[in-house]
Amino acid sequence: MNFNLKQKLDLAPKKPGCYLWKNHLNEIIYIGKAKNIYKRVHQYFNGPKDLKTSKLVNEIFYVEFIEVNNENEALLLEANLIKKHKPRYNILLKDNNGYPYILMTKEKYPRLIYTRNFDPKKGKHYGPFASSEMKAYDLYNLLLKLFPLKNCFNKKGRKCEFYDLNLCMKACTHEVSEADYEVMKKKIDYFFHNGADQVLKDLKEKESIASEKFDFEQAKKYLDLQKAINLIFDKQIINLYSAKERIDVLAYQIKENVICIVLFSYVSSQLVSKNTICDFYYGEEQEVITSYLSQYYKDNIKPKILYASLDQANATLLKDSLGIEIINPTSGKMNEIMSLALQNVTNELSQKYDSLVKKEQRINLALDQLKKLIKVDKLNHLEVYDNSNLFNTDKVSAMIVFENNQFNKKKYRKYKIKDQQALGDYHYMYEVIYRRLYQALKNNFVDLPDLIILDGGKHQVLAAKKAIVDLQIDKKINLIGLAKNNKHQTDKIVTFDLDEISLDKSSALYFFLANLQEEVHKFAISFFRKTKAKSLYDSILDQIKGLGKKRKQQLIEHFKTIDEIKKASIASLSQVLPIEIAKKLKQKLDQS
């Protein structure tokens, strides 16, 4: 333990709050919460430590403390900090489960919005729609036709693009009363809570009335809506998301330093989703569980009741901070469901434990083989580079980072080749390595890799070597290239001195390097395709009169990705653009 850390620990507050362990690069590696910060942080260094805690403690270089009023606040703060910083030793949840919701906003005249983010502050969420049988975006577009709520951002009382098309209730000009609007909101709520039967019945009646009046165009419209409902709407699936009560069941199991957690969500006694995480863990087991739940319910609907085996202190803490009743079932139907969850978690752990541990062992073996081969002592931080282009257009390069036995995606970097005169991999590699190491030079070499790996042979190694020599830092950097044979298979390592070392294709090292190549290639190709797509997208947009820089930016901010813009209907595009421009854009995108 260094002097600064010891001094900081001695001054730790004896109050509730969060502690942030940092490594020698000042990176946050673990975040925890405590009722008494002083007691908790000293537990890491006092008394016997198991393997998992020892690994964490060996990397601790400094610590920060954040005091709060009580343990409830500490738990919520911990979840926010973990989501923000994503420390590698915390059990991390994905940013969201990828399932979409349909949101009714809290505005005076609410809008329906298709979103993948759960944020109760914005309004009422219907979903998540996890089933592949339910095409949620099709359902969203259908709802806009069935229930024509406000579909624009107009706040100035002027007619919107949907007004003359009769695709909205004319809320933009305040021609609809709040009472009528409230009726439409209740119809949507009824639709989700009770299914499509009533809507289908109403549409059938409207179709009959229109036919009797010989208004066959209107009758066909009502018939098409019925067909659309029957095509994408599975009543049973919708009912799973419409019940007033939701119950979650959590089970977990530990084997050595691996924890497996399974969370079931039930609505109307039917299982609607299952979330599983299996990973190495650091810290106390109940602390890990409370941290997991606090993170999970930040981005997911909270149940009325959570059934889980938690000690009284943590159950009370979660109840107070999250507002969820927590019950440890001992008999009856819920005990049977808990047994099912335990059976699932046992199966998950048995399936994943060996693969997790064996993966760790294979990585350690591969790194030991590489150390011996290139005669280095330390390989904790690797950077791998690859270039991608098509006939010297849209030239890009990518860097991935493998650190402490895992990919560190926070440190991945994408590079657009700036030198427009540069032609070929030699020049691209020189520029990228020079830019990366020049940045390190400016930062006093705080985050230099132990080894740079290039997806290429002597040609690329020569380019990187020149960049290193030009920056006069050749004594600080280890470098290798991965050379391919005439069958385009990697079979040699090229060293800094351009020596070639053959690889044993049955070794752990060979498969490890192949995995690094696959990851960096995938990352580089993905970036290249996005760059290429953006070039094409920009050229299409430039052909459309009325689409300036500001409107292009609004499109990206609203739809997030080019793919989402391509999939958007004219109605959706019209939420951002004037209707005529939206039509032209849709036509161009369909032709591209």
Swiss-Prot record:
One of its GO terms (molecular function) is excinuclease ABC activity. SUPFAM superfamilies: GIY-YIG endonuclease, RuvA domain 2-like. Pfam families: GIY-YIG, UvrC_RNaseH, UvrC_RNaseH_dom. GO terms for biological process: nucleotide-excision repair; SOS response. Keywords: Cytoplasm, DNA damage, DNA excision, DNA repair, Excision nuclease, SOS response. Signal peptide: none annotated. CDD domains: GIY-YIG_UvrC_Cho (cd10434). It is found in: Cytoplasm. Gene3D superfamilies: 5' to 3' exonuclease, C-terminal subdomain, GIY-YIG endonuclease, UvrC, RNAse H endonuclease domain. GO terms for cellular component: cytoplasm; excinuclease repair complex. Residues 197-232 form the UVR domain. The UvrABC repair system catalyzes the recognition and processing of DNA lesions. UvrC both incises the 5' and 3' sides of the lesion. The N-terminal half is responsible for the 3' incision and the C-terminal half is responsible for the 5' incision. HAMAP family: UvrC. NCBIfam families: uvrC (TIGR00194). Belongs to the UvrC family. Interacts with UvrB in an incision complex. This is UvrABC system protein C.
